[in-house]
């Protein structure tokens, strides 16, 4: 289907967290049933502005998933709510940890229930065969769980050659203002507010911001802009996200704050500083020197290819599924032996 080969390894039931992450599972060796229509989403179904529906995937509601008789190879979940919703479904389960508990508190989303959520998750993991996979070491430490750490990945061959013809910076972020603490929005604004910048994403409160029309449009935007911006509090969020890795795969240098997990080396693949005035000077330098931007961007692409290739993600997630299946079988055998 569309050039993607699937084995007869069984289907995965995947709760949709966000399309860019789920799309990585295309080509993993399992066809996908994707649960859409979950609360807290910008759209009620799969958002094709983010990614096309993975080849061979079927979209279904939570009720349809709960009533399905399909024997899934594994269930892929992303929150305590997902775990509760899928409690009645038997099968190997993997929960993917995408955020920090501290970030939930900083965003004022769930300051009161963060400790309860962490305890609930730990109880689930101790009493069931659910296996936890964190997208980074920071996220694993925050929740105190994580059987495996599996960063997301990108396919550099999927992106356009970088032209950088627009003397503008670009950033991709949804609900940017609501995540001011996590994303160091004050630093971003102090450094870049007077410079030509494009903010891509669902941000109805920010004039001029909007989502890309589709993935092809996002690739075009990345290809034509001069540099990418990623700022994040080191205590709350990683020094990269999927969008910044996409930018690196597109050959853009990245500007941001100093961060222990940033893949950027200052002066080689981008520029890092906690001083907004210095970040502004770096940005102005790149806006005025497309050759420098191209040189740093080429190194950024080399780094992301070596460290974050989607092949490594898919191999790692196949292993996570196998480990979840093994744990589920052992749990079932112990239950039978106790009868």
Feature locations, PLM:
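Extended catalytic core of nucleotide-activated donor transferases of GT-like folds
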Residues: 18-21, 33-128
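Catalytic core of nucleotide-activated saccharide and alditol-phosphate transferases
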Residues: 81-181
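Short alpha-helical segment that forms part of, or immediately flanks, the ligand-binding pocket
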Residues: 219, 241-249, 262-263, 268
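Acidic donor-binding loop of glycosyltransferase active sites
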Residues: 223-237, 252
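Conserved acidic donor-binding segment of nucleotide-sugar-dependent glycosyltransferases
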Residues: 266-277, 285-291
């Amino acid at each position: 289907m569309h050039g993607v080969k699937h084995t007869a390894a069984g289907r995965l039931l995947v709760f949709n967290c966000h399309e860019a992450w789920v799309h990585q599972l295309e080509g993993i060796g399992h066809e996908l049933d994707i649960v859409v229509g979950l609360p807290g989403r910008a759209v009620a179904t799969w958002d094709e502005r983010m990614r096309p529906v993975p080849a061979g995937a079927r979209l279904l509601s939570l009720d349809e998933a709960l009533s399905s008789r399909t024997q899934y190879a594994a269930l892929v979940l992303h929150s305590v709510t997902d775990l509760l919703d899928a409690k009645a479904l038997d099968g190997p389960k993997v929960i993917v940890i995408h955020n920090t508990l501290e970030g939930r508190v900083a965003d004022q989303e769930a300051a009161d229930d963060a400790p309860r959520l962490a305890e609930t998750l730990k109880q689930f993991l101790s009493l069931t065969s659910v296996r936890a996979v964190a997208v980074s070491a920071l996220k694993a430490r925050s929740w105190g769980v994580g059987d495996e750490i599996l960063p997301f990945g990108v396919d550099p061959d999927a992106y356009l050659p970088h032209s950088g013809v627009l003397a503008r910076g670009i950033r991709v972020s949804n609900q940017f203002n609501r995540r001011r603490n996590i994303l160091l929005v004050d630093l971003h604004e102090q450094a870049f507010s007077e410079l030509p910048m494009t903010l891509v994403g669902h941000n109805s409160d920010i004039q001029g911001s909007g989502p890309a029309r589709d993935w092809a449009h996002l690739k075009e935007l990345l290809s034509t802009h001069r540099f990418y911006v990623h700022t994040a509090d080191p205590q709350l969020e990683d020094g990269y996200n999927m969008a910044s890795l996409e930018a690196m795969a597109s050959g853009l240098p990245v500007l941001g704050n100093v961060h222990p997990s940033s893949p950027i080396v200052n002066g080689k693949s981008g520029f890092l500083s906690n001083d907004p005035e210095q970040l502004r000077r770096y940005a102005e330098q790149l806006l005025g020197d497309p050759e420098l931007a191209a040189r740093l961007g080429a190194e950024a692409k080399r780094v992301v290819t070596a460290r974050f290739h989607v092949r490594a993600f898919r191999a790692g997630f196949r292993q996570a599924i196998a480990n979840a299946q093994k744990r589920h079988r052992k749990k079932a055998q112990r239950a039978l032996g106790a009868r």
